[in-house]
């Protein structure tokens, strides 16, 4: 018993002397390594959350923490837990430099279900898709209505802009067609579909390096809590897999690709501050 008391006393003394060293720093690097998963609105107002993020003070904000919101798109409302997936992911990235502190938020479920295009084609790459030109602007409008326009950040994203239907896809498996080298462009965005690396940590079905764009690293949410990607729904990613297929996450959690006209889930991300 005396030995246990002595050990406890030693540990308590060490903690007292070094608690500053043992505490979690308030920066992005430290907070991208800790998952919690609570409703932030039970502790803070949204104004307080936003003020902390804009100041780069991520104290008591952790991966998996969320803000419940209801978005209305094309007359249909859907409630999601908009979850912190990464702190300062886009910092110093883009055709124009990103210098503002932010968090990436992703919904806990799909907002709705729709094809990337009206037919099974990937012509024009991600930029040329109906999802890019029509659906993402609708989502952005709904986000600004729900969160407030000043809290939905614009960011510069590198996206694919064309597809060569005759080249071999880097996805393998006999797939034909893909995004040619240098077939990309910088686009100013307010929300977008995630890339394969943002979800899986690497490419699986993406046809070329141009499908990766700015989303080149895995989001901390999916690294720390892989079940966050497995929501028992099919949901689209931005990568071109072939001349007729885009990448997606399967309802069983597998990486997959399928015809662009299929009505799969829309699960975008945006930068919140």
Predicted regions and their residues:
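Collagenous Gly-X-Y triple-helix signature in extracellular proteins
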Residues: 22-273
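Short, low-complexity N-terminal tether/leader segments at secretion or assembly junctions of large
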Residues: 1-23
């Amino acid at each position: 018993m005396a030995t246990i008391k002595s050990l406890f006393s030693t540990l308590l003394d060490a903690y007292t002397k070094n608690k500053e060293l043992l505490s979690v720093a308030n920066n992005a690097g430290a907070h991208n390594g800790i998952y919690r998963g609570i409703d932030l609105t039970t502790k803070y107002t949204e104004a307080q959350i936003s003020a902390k993020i804009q100041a780069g003070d991520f104290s008591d904000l952790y991966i998996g923490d969320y803000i419940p919101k209801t978005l209305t798109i094309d007359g249909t409302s859907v409630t999601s837990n908009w979850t912190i997936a990464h702190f300062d992911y886009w910092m110093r990235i883009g055709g124009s430099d990103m210098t503002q502190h932010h968090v990436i938020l992703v919904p806990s479920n799909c907002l709705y279900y729709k094809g990337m295009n009206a037919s099974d084609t990937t012509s024009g790459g991600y930029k040329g898709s109906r999802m890019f030109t029509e659906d993402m602007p609708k989502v952005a409008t709904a986000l600004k209505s729900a969160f407030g326009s000043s809290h939905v950040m614009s960011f510069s994203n590198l996206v694919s802009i064309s597809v060569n239907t005759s080249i071999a896809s880097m996805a393998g498996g006999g797939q034909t067609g893909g995004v040619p080298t240098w077939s990309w462009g910088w686009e100013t965005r307010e929300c977008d579909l995630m890339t394969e690396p943002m979800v899986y940590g690497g490419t699986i079905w993406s046809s070329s390096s141009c499908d990766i764009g700015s989303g080149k690293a895995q989001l901390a949410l999916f690294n720390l809590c892989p079940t966050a990607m497995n929501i028992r729904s099919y949901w689209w990613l931005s990568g071109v897999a072939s001349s007729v297929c885009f990448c997606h996450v399967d309802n069983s959690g597998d990486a997959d690709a399928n015809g662009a006209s299929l009505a799969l889930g829309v699960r975008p991300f945006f930068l919140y501050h």
